């Protein structure tokens, strides 16, 4: 890896892109010259050497959906499988090549038409070669003594399995075995730093992905009702994504009613909703491979009960406290502290905790900071600051500690506070004197709120012009949600009870 003191000069990528896109009309598409600027910004980080970036491989079985490796997609915009990019830098000059499989009529009858190597330069801006020539090219470059920098394909383990024996990792092992003197360094961190700052074209794609996603949330709010299956709402959401131009769900759609709303990554979507419960929907589409991430919580019967309203409003107020502190070149720490203070005050007011700094002896698997596990951690299971969005639903962001630790222009990210009162919460605590004293105080209140889960997740883009709320299309204030849910919607196909009039 390049020395930590070697950074892309501030604004280099933005400057390259600005020059490349001068006089280009604004549109929801990334120009080939922007991809060229990204590659130039990456190779600017090395004096000389060979950069090798691996695309994703075609799934062995046909039912998994192919996902391009995000780092590779960022550098090339090429969405087909089994491709490899090389960039060779010598004496300041860079030669790039995109290696792709040879087209065969039989394979194309099964998998569809692929881009020929001869057509790659027109399509991607990078000259192409058949992948059969990749090994010979690499052996020749290794013999030259140039250092190698690898942009790995390990990110694919997020999509399929935890197996890290990817094509890229095997390549590194084999190359090192054949050339033990060769200098080899990862370049993934450099790519993440570039990806963290979104260009205007990327923000436009994320804006459109979020608009489609919020439209789907509106449809879900109008359809949800007692007796409706979570799976029916899932189908409605994902159908709406496609109907309005989305590629696919950006991640597994979470449609959790009742106790399922307290499971953060619940994806079975198999339960029938009941009157008096909350419904938590965490679902969004990708658009041109850029994924949004939106969550809304609503009452199944269209009317928040007093208890539901109280829990929901704490989450909403915490989100607002966090958002008010978002500014360029500011750490997220102060925003987190502000949101946490709102949550602590709200939980104390409801009687779910004894004090803002009160602790418990944690259940198995709970991670705690120094000083012990706060009681509020039983209900606030994750941070408020969310994550970046982009080519991955959890994308790099400049305010991440390992990148810049400060918000910057071009950050696109979520703010997603949540509170969850699991029905199993009390039983999960170890039997200790401290916990017995805690339970004696809060048990009746915990039982009152048991089975309620609330999360509100919104997408924001931070630019020099200010903070843009991209997900404003999905209602999040209690009166707005209830008003939308009073609207009638035709029954879903299949005879489900979703959308029937409320009494």
Q: Where in this protein do the model-derived segments appear?
A:
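Bacterial N-terminal signal peptides
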Residues: 11-23
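Bacterial N-terminal signal peptides that target proteins for export
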Residues: 1-13
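Active-site neighborhoods and metal-handling regions in enzymes and metal-associated proteins
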Residues: 2-3, 26-503
